[in-house]
């Protein structure tokens, strides 16, 4: 099951980088809980969709350096560039996803600015 969860996450990530929010959301449960540690939580696809519309005006650019799977969980570690007003800001991240019935049900995202690398 872990390999299937990894494949689903990779499919969802590909949709995000292509700007395909609906393709990403198709990999999620309707009652998804998306928590960015230190910022708050979104509940449900409608809330995630709205957040993406507001915050992913340009698709984020990210590189997954490691996927670690254990049972119903997959952790993705990597780097992320978020473009705001035409300026790419480098970040480091770790997303911990919980899967249910083959789809993403919960995210705990740890995202921090990374001034040690260039965008």
Model-assigned labels for residue ranges:
Residues 1-11, 33-35, 39, 47-119:
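A beta-strand edge to alpha-helix "cap/lid" segment located at domain peripheries
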Residues 18-31:
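Short, well-ordered alpha-helical segments enriched in acidic and aromatic residues
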